[in-house]
């Protein structure tokens, strides 16, 4: 069964202050999954592995994600033997890559259509047998009895209803001294211009309605939240997309460029005493 057959078979807060009050500052642990967001990504699922479809930017970003993780881990063959949990895996773009690099990956997504696409695509590659497990669900609701060396959650935070609660759920799945690797979008006017106005409405390289500005979280807000929980920030870097070259560029360590004003990656380490 080829990729086209798979794709054809699967069918597809008024202000940030209010969002923060409901999310980061709320002590109530609520479910983070948004029905509207799940419906949106169910629609995108049918083109997840189409390089010219709505997930094209994620395909182009994937090697940059792996580069960031490799630099942060500072280990040779850094994925080999690692137990990794990939939350919000979508169709499995990152999950498959990490499994091919030697990790044992458990991948979870709230979209049933995305998980169906991911399973069928992974079945095409025998190398992934025994290395990659897909689960339909959420980090709060999925039966995950163990903790992991690494938890990844890429391009997901900007889509959840309760970011604070969601982050706590992610953090619980990381073993002591393990890593949490995140990527999301900063809540700045530049990010709004680039990710919503330009990417969605002008260039149409991202489906309209994919992003909600009020859900974006600034890099300093996210890093400060993690520090308050006594986590160590290993690295935080911006990543910029050049539509002319059609490529993503990762900021150099310590860079104070414009990258953190839009898309950014963050790696944090759980304290041993946690």
UniProtKB/Swiss-Prot annotation:
Any GO BP annotation: ubiquinone biosynthetic process
Annotated Mg(2+) binding sites: 155, 158-159
Record keywords, A-Z: Magnesium, Membrane, Metal-binding, Methyltransferase, Mitochondrion, Mitochondrion inner membrane, S-adenosyl-L-methionine, Transferase, Transit peptide, Ubiquinone biosynthesis
Residues engaged in binding S-adenosyl-L-methionine: 65, 88, 109, 154
FT transit peptide: 1-30
Phenotype of the disrupted gene, per the record: Leads to respiration deficiency.
EC number: 2.1.1.64, 2.1.1.-, 2.1.1.114
Alphabetized GO MF terms: 3-demethylubiquinol 3-O-methyltransferase activity; 3-demethylubiquinone 3-O-methyltransferase activity; polyprenyldihydroxybenzoate methyltransferase activity
EC top class named in words: transferase
Gene Ontology annotations for the cellular component aspect, listed alphabetically: extrinsic component of mitochondrial inner membrane; mitochondrion
Alphabetized InterPro entries for the sequence: SAM-dependent_MTases_sf, UbiG_MeTrfase
Pfam families noted in UniProt: Methyltransf_23 (PF13489)
Topological category with respect to the lipid bilayer: Peripheral membrane protein
Main location class: mitochondrion
Gene3D superfamilies: Vaccinia Virus protein VP39 (3.40.50.150)
Subcellular location(s) of the protein: Mitochondrion inner membrane
Family the entry assigns: Belongs to the class I-like SAM-binding methyltransferase superfamily. UbiG/COQ3 family.
Known role: O-methyltransferase required for two non-consecutive steps during ubiquinone biosynthesis. Catalyzes the 2 O-methylation of 3,4-dihydroxy-5-(all-trans-decaprenyl)benzoic acid into 4-hydroxy-3-methoxy-5-(all-trans-decaprenyl)benzoic acid. Also catalyzes the last step of ubiquinone biosynthesis by mediating methylation of 3-demethylubiquinone into ubiquinone. Also able to mediate the methylation of 3-demethylubiquinol-10 into ubiquinol-10.
Assembly with partners or alone: Component of a multi-subunit COQ enzyme complex, composed of at least coq3, coq4, coq5, coq6, coq7 and coq9.
Name by which UniProt lists this protein: Ubiquinone biosynthesis O-methyltransferase, mitochondrial
Organism taxonomic ancestry: Eukaryota, Fungi, Dikarya, Ascomycota, Taphrinomycotina
Gene expressing this chain: coq3
């Amino acid at each position: 069964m080829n990729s086209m057959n798979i794709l054809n078979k699967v069918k597809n807060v008024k202000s940030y202050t209010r969002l923060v009050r409901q999310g980061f500052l709320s002590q109530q642990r609520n479910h983070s999954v948004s029905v509207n967001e799940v419906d949106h990504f169910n629609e995108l699922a049918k083109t997840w592995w189409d390089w010219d479809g709505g997930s094209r930017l994620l395909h182009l970003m994937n090697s940059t994600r792996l580069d960031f993780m490799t630099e942060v881990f500072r280990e040779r063959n850094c994925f080999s033997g690692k137990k990794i949990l990939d939350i919000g895996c979508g169709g499995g773009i990152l999950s498959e890559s990490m499994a091919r690099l030697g990790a044992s990956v458990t991948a979870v997504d709230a979209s049933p259509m995305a998980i169906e696409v991911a399973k069928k695509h992974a079945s095409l590659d025998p190398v992934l047998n025994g290395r990659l497990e897909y689960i339909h669900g959420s980090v709060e609701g999925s039966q995950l009895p163990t903790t992991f060396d690494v938890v990844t959650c890429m391009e997901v935070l900007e889509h959840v209803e309760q970011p604070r609660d969601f982050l706590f759920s992610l953090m619980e799945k990381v073993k002591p001294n393990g890593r949490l690797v995140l990527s999301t979008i900063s809540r700045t006017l530049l990010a709004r211009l680039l990710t919503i106005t330009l990417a969605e409405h002008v260039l149409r390289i991202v489906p309209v309605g994919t992003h909600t500005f009020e859900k974006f979280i600034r890099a300093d807000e996210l890093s400060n939240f993690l520090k308050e929980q006594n986590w160590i920030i290993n690295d935080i870097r911006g990543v910029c997309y050049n539509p002319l070259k059609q490529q993503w560029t990762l900021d150099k360590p310590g860079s104070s460029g414009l990258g953190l004003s839009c898309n950014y990656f963050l790696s944090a380490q759980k304290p041993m005493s946690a």
